[in-house]
């Protein structure tokens, strides 16, 4: 191999290694971690100011007194970074999809036509899809570590079966539909940037 080819090969390896900087990140949402929900996210750079974030989570546990917030959820998000990707302010457009089995949860809240207090007396099993807009900010903690905060609002459509009690009751509604408008994303992410 000629000296020129060797230099060219080494230069291309250095350039490709430098090109990986701020191109890929993995993350965990600390809010989901606090609720025992297993979650993992990844983000890849698409262009100088655009990234694609994909997060997924799973909670398959039944807690004491038969409380359950069982679900799996996938949330892809296209992000725009006004300054540098994976640092500072960002705006996102996200979608969501998943399944759930929720009951015996005491949440006394009525939000824009959704009565969450019914989760105490009934169990709901179904699926949901939706979309929303988000705003967030990423702080650099160290060379490879970031902390991200994000909030999103949007719409979700769900279809569900409704049961009388939390685990064994008779079905009282079959294949009902509901439109939800409100928060669709909340995250405090611990991020490792490659």
Region spans (language model):
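Solvent-exposed loop/turn segments connecting transmembrane beta-strands
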Residues: 26-41, 59-70, 85
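Residues that define the transmembrane beta-barrel architecture of outer-membrane proteins
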Residues: 22, 34-36, 68-74, 87, ...
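Repeated loop/turn-to-beta-strand initiation elements of outer-membrane beta-barrel proteins
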Residues: 24, 50-52, 86, 144-147
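Flexible, solvent-exposed loop segments that connect beta-strands
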Residues: 58-71, 99-127, 159-179
């Amino acid at each position: 191999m000629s000296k020129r080819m060797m230099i060219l090969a080494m230069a291309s390896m250095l350039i490709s290694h430098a090109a990986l900087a701020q191109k890929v990140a993995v993350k965990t949402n600390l809010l989901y971690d606090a609720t025992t929900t297993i979650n993992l996210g990844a983000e890849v750079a698409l262009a100088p100011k655009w990234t694609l974030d994909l997060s997924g989570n799973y909670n398959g546990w039944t807690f004491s007194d038969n409380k359950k917030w069982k679900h799996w959820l996938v949330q892809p998000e296209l992000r725009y970074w006004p300054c540098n990707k994976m640092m500072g302010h960002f705006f996102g457009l996200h979608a969501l999809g998943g399944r759930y089995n929720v009951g015996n949860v005491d949440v006394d809240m009525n939000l824009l036509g959704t009565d969450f207090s019914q989760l105490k007396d009934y169990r709901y099993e179904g699926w949901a899809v939706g979309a929303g807009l988000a705003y967030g900010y990423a702080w650099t903690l160290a060379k490879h570590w970031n902390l991200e905060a994000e909030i999103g609002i949007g719409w979700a459509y769900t279809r569900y079966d409704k049961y009388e009690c939390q685990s064994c009751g008779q079905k009282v509604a079959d294949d009902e539909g509901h439109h939800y408008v409100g928060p669709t994303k909340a995250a405090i992410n611990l991020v490792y940037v490659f």
